[in-house]
Amino acid sequence: MSKLAELQAETREIIEDLLNDGSEPNALYIIEHHIAHHDFDLLEKIAVDAFKAGYEVSEAEEFKDDDGKPIFCFDIISEVELKAEIIDAQQKEILPLLEKHNGIYDGWGTYFEDPNADDDEYGDDGEFLDDEDEYGDDGEFFDDEDEEEPRVH
């Protein structure tokens, strides 16, 4: 089975699990494609390419891999319907960016959308993502002062 076929099968399983758990089928979902690289400069090139392709990008975070070596990570983010074909198309667009710079694709994730939720996390404009620049206040992609807990996915 090819890498893309494996990713497509995983996408369908994730979507099926979310919907079987009761997540809202008609909601817009924040899709976060998890990207990593041991070389920060190459990771930044992937982020720039993704941004130029129309995606939002999160700030980079630094972690230690299983061998204790630094690894840098960020997310390529979009807000779309929870449809396998859309995520497949995103992966087909994102994977060549990673291959170009020898990046690591660590899958994608999203959040459960409760159909019975009263509160609106999307704010007054109805959009979760805003049009503000995702880079830090100083224009840097990586902020040395941010120390965040590792994400669990």
From Swiss-Prot:
Record keyword Cytoplasm present: yes
Protein's cellular compartments: Cytoplasm
GO MF annotation terms: endoribonuclease inhibitor activity; enzyme binding
The keyword Cytoplasm is annotated on this UniProt entry: yes
Residue spans of biased composition, Acidic residues class: 115-153
Major subcellular site: cytoplasm
Key words, A-Z: Cytoplasm
GO CC term (a single one): cytoplasm
Protein family membership: Belongs to the RraB family.
Function field: Globally modulates RNA abundance by binding to RNase E (Rne) and regulating its endonucleolytic activity. Can modulate Rne action in a substrate-dependent manner by altering the composition of the degradosome.
SUBUNIT field: Interacts with the C-terminal region of Rne.
The protein's name: Regulator of ribonuclease activity B
Source species: Haemophilus influenzae (strain ATCC 51907 / DSM 11121 / KW20 / Rd)
Gene that produces this protein: rraB
